[in-house]
Design a protein with these regions (language model features):
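Extracellular lectin-like interaction modules
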Residues: 1-183
Length: 183
């Protein structure tokens, strides 16, 4: 359990046990490269927000069910979980690699449910994004398969969205850039 507003280390952070957030929490590692990795090797729960700041890799190795999730820009994020669920926004500012077929979902309404990918997404896995808010793809996507649900909106500001399988957009889509969709 974490009841602190901040946890800051000069090196790695590894959470091997199920983690419950009792407070809105920012985890920061000031380590360079792999010395800055923040790894969650079990579930994360709690009706609180989680922000992870690191120049290393943020690794989610199990399911997440929290209020809000944000990762910063200098590092990378890897998702090896079946689900990342929030009641609010999800904002990924790092390049993302999918290590498992993953469903990202938010039950937030309108802007409170936005799921934003502000950097690239790679990995030969399936990504499903379910939200009544806006799903934003701001950089290039190169994955196995992509599906968005019916409830929200999709905005694409990326030059390319490439999949080895299908792409299914069930939301209304707005193109913010000249974009090539390729499967």
């Amino acid at each position: 359990q974490i009841n602190a507003a901040t946890v800051t280390t000069s090196g790695t952070q590894t959470y091997n046990d199920p983690l419950t957030l009792l407070n809105n929490t920012t985890l920061t590692s000031n380590g360079a490269g792999a010395l800055g990795n923040v790894s969650f090797n079990s579930t994360i729960g709690g009706a609180k927000t989680l922000t992870v700041n690191t120049a290393g890799t943020t690794l989610f190795n199990d399911n997440v069910n929290i209020a809000q999730l944000t990762t910063d820009a200098p590092g990378t994020v890897q998702i090896n979980a079946a689900t990342v669920a929030t009641t609010g926004t999800q904002t990924y500012n790092d390049p993302m690699t999918l290590l498992a077929n993953t469903v990202l979902s938010s039950t937030g309404v309108a802007a409170a449910g936005n799921i934003s990918f502000n950097n690239t997404i790679t990995g030969d896995k399936t990504l499903a994004v379910n939200t009544a808010g806006t799903t934003l793809f701001d950089k290039a996507v190169s994955i196995g398969q992509l599906t968005t649900d019916l409830a929200g909106f999709v905005q694409i500001n990326a030059p390319t969205v490439i999949t080895t399988g299908t792409q299914t957009y069930n939301d209304p889509m707005t193109l913010l850039a000249n974009t090539v969709l390729s499967s």
